Amino acid sequence: MAKRALGLGQKNREKKRKVESGSEGGSRNATPTVTNQIQIELGEGVDPDNELAQLHGLWLNYFKSERDDEYMLNGIVHECDRLIRQAQEDEEMAKQLNDRFHAIYALALSELTIFKAAEEEGKERKLVSEFFGNALDRLSYGQAAHPDSNLLKLVFAKILLQRIPLEYIFKLEVDSEEKLDLHQKLEDAKKNFVIVDSDLELSYEVLNMLNDLLDIVENFGHEDDIEEGLDSDDEDGIDLVELKTTHPLYQIQQQVPENYQWLRSSFDNLLESIKEKDSELFRSVARSIGELLLKEAEEPASTYLSIIYGNEDDDEDVEPTDESKEAQKKAQELTKKALEYLEKAQNEEDPKTWVQVAEAQIDLGNLLDYQSSEQESAYKKAEDILRKANKATKGKFQFILDNLLEKE
């Protein structure tokens, strides 16, 4: 792999450094940060002097990092600006500004909104709105030049899904009635989503953004409860807040189940597109599918368990009803399917992934007939996994094992 020290947009960075240092007395001797000279890893056969290759390498550095370096993002944006100015005077450079260039430019602008949101207080996020607008403008230029680009469609979906919570939902109350057309924005994002084989990790991130958005919508109005310690994944769950039909989130809230189905189907398609079955991306996607299946199993599981075990004061056995049998069957099917994906997601180096399988085995055991051989088998599998995980982590998951042993 070729590596070189990268100094993108040096003049722009020098200007920015002077502006920033001005608040400290305008010193010209400011200490350079590590982002001024970054080691960029380029693919085999890539010209290390190619400016677009450098730009792509820098973006990947940011994309695969902790994403806490606003200065690096500004460097990417400044370099994109410089290349555009150069392209206005250099026909050869103009030809090189491909769809990936426009994608990187738009992505960098949209990522900067995260930092701008942290800077802006109150209910108006003017900088956030401005940067999202600039990102979409840049994307429209790219799509005009490259109308068949799937990468630009994917980036458009990402920007929309990032914008809905960051610019709009954060300021909403339960009684809000603003006309924000959020449902249409979500539908536009789904319509433009496409799996790009050269950017599978970005494809995965876009789907994760939708997953996060649906979770936000489900928990909307319960933010204070969650802050006080009620987990949105608690066993008893929390009821959806009833919104007026005029509320900006009403339509999205009404279609949460359908959107989860679309999301799971898209994750399935993404998993099939990943050729490296032992990659972390494959395991992450498989885990996401497994978790969505467990989530779908929650309602029928709750129905079954409440009918069969709901009356703690009644010592007599409860006869299964048609409703409980149907709920039990559906919950079992979904949980067994979830287990298949969670087993694919296991990482031999990460005991947490083993424990996730064990917990799903416990869920399955709870859905099997009381004290049946199948139930005992499910619990035993979970116990074996938990003992292995505890041994590897010096008892980190002992509390889960203790709870399981109380069942037996």
From Swiss-Prot:
Disulfide bonds: none annotated. Pfam families: Nro1. It is found in: Nucleus. The keyword Nucleus applies. Residues 1-33, 311-330 are annotated as: Disordered. Residues 311-321 have a biased composition (Acidic residues). Belongs to the ETT1 family. Required for correct translation termination and probably involved in regulation of hypoxic gene expression. This is Enhancer of translation termination 1. The gene is ETT1.
